[in-house]
Amino acid sequence: MKNARKIKDLLYEQVARIGKVFSSPKRLELIELLCQGEKRVETLASEASISVKLTSSHLRELRMAQLVETERQGKNIYYRLADKSVANLWVQIHMLAEERLVELQLALQKFVTQPDDLIPSDRDSLLKAARKGEVVVLDVRPADEYLNAHLPFARSIPLDELRQRLAELPKDRSIVAYCRGPYCLMAVDAVALLKQEGFTAIHLRDGIAEWEAAVSG
C-alpha cells in the first residue's frame, strides 16, 4: 500500500491523543470526579483543589479528546463523561498501575489501605449480606453523587454529616463505608470515626466506577 508508513503514523497519533489526556494527574482526578456524575467547573475546581482557570484548561483537553461532554442548564455549564467506557478505561488504567508500580503499591499501603479492607473478590458476599440486612453499606460521598448512582442497598450519610448522624446507624451490624474509589480518603476517615465511636466498620476500596466495571466486565 502506498504511503503505508504515513497512514500508520496517523493512526497511532490519533490513539495517542487518549494517552496524552490520561498522562496528567489532575486530569485523572477530574475523570474520577466525573465518574460520580455531572459537575460544574467551579465544583470540580474546588474538589480537585485547583483554580477554575486550570480546571477549565484540563476540561478543554478532555473535551477535545471526546472524553467529556457539556450541557448548559440556565447560566451554568455542566460537564459529564462522554459514556461509561471512559470510566471503565480509568478503572483499567489505575488497576494496571496498582499491579505494576511498586511505588503506588507502597503509597496505597501507607495512606489508604486498611488491614481489614474488603477486596474485589468480596463483592458477591457483600451484596448478599447487604440484601439480607446483615451489614450496612454506607455511602459517605456528597448527597448529589449518591443520588446520581450508588452501590446496591447503600444508604447515604455524607462524611461531613456523619458525626451528627451516628444515631442513625446500628451498632449490632458491620458498617461497610465507601466513597469515590481507591484513592478517595473520605471512607478511610469515616471508618476511623466509626471505630472511634464503637462501631464495627470496614473500608470498601471500590467506588461506583469500580463496582460497575466489575459487574459489566
Regions found by a protein language model. Name each.
Residues 1-11:
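Long, low-complexity, charged/polar intrinsically disordered regions in eukaryotic proteins
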Residues 13-51, 77-82:
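N-terminal helix-turn-helix DNA-binding core of bacterial DNA-binding proteins
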Residues 50, 80-136, 140-148:
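Flexible, polar/low-complexity N-terminal or interdomain linker segments that lie immediately upstream
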Residues 59-60:
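Short, hydrophobic-biased segments on the C-terminal half of alpha helices
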Residues 63-73:
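Beta-hairpin "wing" of winged helix-turn-helix
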Residues 67, 169-212:
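Catalytic cysteine-centered active loop of the rhodanese-like fold, especially the PTP/DSP P-loop
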Residues 125-189:
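Positively charged, proline/Ser/Thr-rich regional signature most characteristic
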